[in-house]
């Protein structure tokens, strides 16, 4: 009888421990999902005031000829060496403001940068086409 109670207590302890790990996993996943933030023009401009922030334009060279956000660095998302170029130019501890033409490529670029270890990514939701 004592052995059975002991086994049941061990089982309950294991279940409790698994619940803790599951909660930690859920919290970690939530933080990862929201570490890339879509922002509107007003918020993007506020973030630009941070002197340590870096602005990354992921459009093609032809698109950049039409204009760009002042102070931005251009690395085309379609470049074979996209990630290595960004890593060479932008430290991973910096706030990175990312934009493309309409918001699609910048969202994909942010996913790739997040996987590479960038923590503070902000994606201009309307892209350069919606920039004022």
List PLM regions with ranges.
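Rhodanese-like catalytic fold shared by cysteine-dependent sulfurtransferases
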Residues: 2, 19-21, 33-53, 62-95, ...
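Short, surface-exposed ligand- or partner-binding patches at beta-edge/loop junctions that are enriched
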Residues: 99
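Structural scaffold elements adjacent to functional motifs in cytosolic proteins
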Residues: 55-57
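Short, Lys/Arg-enriched N-terminal segments with co-localized hydrophobic residues
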Residues: 1-18
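Short helix-onset patch at the extreme N-terminus, typifying the N->h transition
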Residues: 7-8, 23-25, 42
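Enrichment for repetitive, rod-forming helical segments
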Residues: 11, 26-27, 66, 112
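Hydrophobic h-region of N-terminal signal peptides that target proteins for export
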Residues: 26-34
């Amino acid at each position: 009888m004592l052995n059975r109670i002991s086994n049941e207590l061990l089982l309950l302890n294991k279940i409790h421990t698994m619940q803790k790990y599951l909660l930690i996993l859920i919290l970690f996943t939530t933080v990862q999902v929201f570490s890339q933030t879509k922002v509107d023009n007003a918020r993007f401009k506020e973030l630009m005031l941070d002197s340590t922030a870096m602005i990354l334009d992921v459009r093609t060279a032809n698109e950049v000829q039409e204009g760009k956000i002042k102070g931005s660095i251009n690395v085309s998302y379609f470049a074979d060496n996209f990630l290595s170029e960004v890593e060479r130019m932008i430290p991973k501890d910096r706030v990175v403001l990312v934009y493309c033409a309409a918001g699609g490529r910048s969202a994909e670029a942010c996913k790739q940068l997040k996987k590479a270890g960038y923590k503070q990514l902000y994606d201009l939701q309307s892209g350069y086409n919606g920039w004022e």
